[in-house]
Amino acid sequence: MKVTLIAILTCAAVLVLHTTAAEELEESQLMEVGMPDTELAAVDEERLFECSISCEIEKKGESCKPKKCKGGWKCKFNMCVKV
């Protein structure tokens, strides 16, 4: 009887510790609300400008499609599109 009780209490303690650790990990991986939005907006504007300029330059001889924007973005319709 004592062994069963000890086993149940041990399992409960392990479960609580595991759940707490999982919650802490999840909280550490969450994005902060305020700052990243403004950073993303600035990056998007920069990519749009960069792509528009490269498209304008390349349109003089060939199509814009072979030119790719940096970081997984592609130039399409004179704008950067996420690939």
From Swiss-Prot:
Q: Does the keyword Secreted apply?
A: yes
What does UniProt list as this organism's lineage?
Answer: Eukaryota, Metazoa, Ecdysozoa, Arthropoda, Chelicerata
What keywords are annotated for this sequence in UniProt?
Disulfide bond, Neurotoxin, Postsynaptic neurotoxin, Secreted, Signal, Toxin
Q: List the disulfide bonds.
A: C51-C64, C55-C75, C69-C80
> Which tissues does it occur in?
Expressed by the venom gland.
Q: What does this protein do?
A: Lethal neurotoxin that blocks neuromuscular transmission.
Query: In the record, which residues are listed under signal peptide?
Result: 1-21
Q: Where in the cell is it found?
A: Secreted
Q: Name one Pfam family in it.
A: Toxin_20
Q: Which InterPro entries match?
A: Hwtx-2-like (IPR012625)
Predominantly, its location class is: secreted
* SUPFAM superfamilies linked to this entry: omega toxin-like (SSF57059)
Q: Which GO terms describe its cellular component?
A: extracellular region; host cell postsynaptic membrane
Keyword Transmembrane appears in the UniProt entry: no
A molecular function GO annotation = toxin activity
- Propeptide stretch(es), residue numbers: 22-48
Protein family per UniProt: Belongs to the neurotoxin 12 (Hwtx-2) family. 02 (Hwtx-2) subfamily.
This protein's superkingdom?
Eukaryota
Can you say what this protein is called? U1-theraphotoxin-Hs1f
Organism encoding this protein: Cyriopagopus schmidti
